[in-house]
Regions:
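A short beta-loop-alpha structural element at the N-terminal edge
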Residues: 1-27
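Hydrophobic adenine-recognition pocket in adenosine-nucleotide-binding enzymes
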Residues: 5, 103-105, 138
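Conserved GNAT-fold acetyl-CoA-binding loop/helix
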Residues: 22-48
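A short helix-loop-beta-strand connector motif used in the catalytic cores of GNAT acetyltransferases and
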Residues: 44-62, 99
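Conserved beta-strand in the GNAT
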Residues: 62, 68-76, 99, 104
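Conserved acyl-donor/pantetheine-binding loop and adjacent beta-alpha core of acyl/acetyltransferases
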Residues: 77-98
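Conserved beta-strand-loop-alpha-helix junction that forms the acyl-donor binding cleft
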Residues: 110, 121, 135-145, 162-165
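Conserved active-site alpha-helix within GNAT-family acetyltransferase domains
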Residues: 116, 120, 128, 140-158
Length: 165
């Protein structure tokens, strides 16, 4: 079952976010240390993310199996209006975009369609809100995630290059 996150889901969401952060650290060669070191740090980060999500007309949905939260997705809406950003105006039309910030499914539940269900729910929300596209960022070394996103219709659009100094 996919539903909107409730305050009762916080501990499970915090634990999943902490696992996700450790995974990112393993893949991201530009990070010298974990962004946060404990579940308390994850809790702080998730509270900020939830507050930001609310202020940006976003949502957090969870996937639940047998009364256990096994995955979540977070997304926000970004509206680009003509004249707000001169550089953006040079290369884009005014638009309303859905942005996926986080998507996580517990390892034991991957490959069972939960990620697709979560994305489908967020896509439905973005569509109702009038978004014309959905965007997300994925680490270039995260082959599984890239394959997943391509399989459901995402295409590679921009490539961000980073150099440590």
């Amino acid at each position: 079952m996919i539903r909107e996150m409730t305050p009762e889901d916080r501990n499970e969401i915090d634990e999943m976010q902490f696992e996700l952060q450790k995974f990112f650290f393993e893949l991201d060669q530009t990070r010298e240390s974990l962004s946060y070191q404990s579940i308390d740090d994850a809790h702080y980060y998730m509270q900020k993310m939830i507050d930001d999500t609310k202020s940006m007309d976003g949502k957090v949905f969870v996937a639940e199996k047998n009364n256990v939260v096994v995955g979540f997705i977070q997304g926000v809406i970004i509206e680009h209006k003509k004249g707000e950003d001169k550089i953006y105006d040079l290369s884009h039309n005014p638009s309303k975009e859905g942005w996926i910030g986080l998507l996580y499914v517990k390892p034991d539940y991957r490959g069972s369609g939960i990620g697709q269900e979560l994305l489908g729910k967020m896509k439905d929300y973005f569509t109702v809100q009038g978004c014309t596209s959905i965007k997300l960022l994925v680490l270039s070394d995260n082959a599984n995630a890239i394959g997943f996103y391509k399989k459901i219709g995402f295409i590679a659009h921009n490539l961000e290059m980073v150099m440590k100094v």
